[in-house]
Amino acid sequence: MNIFFLDKDPKIAAQLQCDKHVVKMVLETAQMLSTAARKRGFELGYKSAYPKHPMTLWVNESPHNYAWAIQHGLALGTEYQLRYRKVYKSHEVIKELTMLDDGDSTQMTKPPQCMPDEYKTEDYVQSYRNYYVGDKKRFAKYTNRTTPEFMQ
């Protein structure tokens, strides 16, 4: 369970993710958003999952965080379609959850850094890039995308 903040822009952050994470993170983002929706009293999306995980808590912390996660999840679903020419069911779940989006993603709070300490800096984007290069590069592939500059 994580969100890879590889850029402050939720769409660019999705585009910078490797194939493995594009597949995995659409589902995880839908689960976090669904858990936040259920905490607000709405029976939408998936059943609650990992409600005490720092990233799930962050998504639910403010409407602005939820908005960022919605935009990121939708962008991940679009990335999945671009790379694999298929529609991911979790993308449809995220579309359903947009009805609860009443925040401004540019006003999000600083996200937790869910990674080993060795990659952490004051800048969460740089931290997630460090984590990606240090821990994910060995399996990172980019179908129908150029490998991001920070991964070269």
Predicted regions located by residue number:
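Expand to "…catalyze enediolate/carbanion chemistry for C-C bond making/breaking, isomerization
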Residues: 1-152
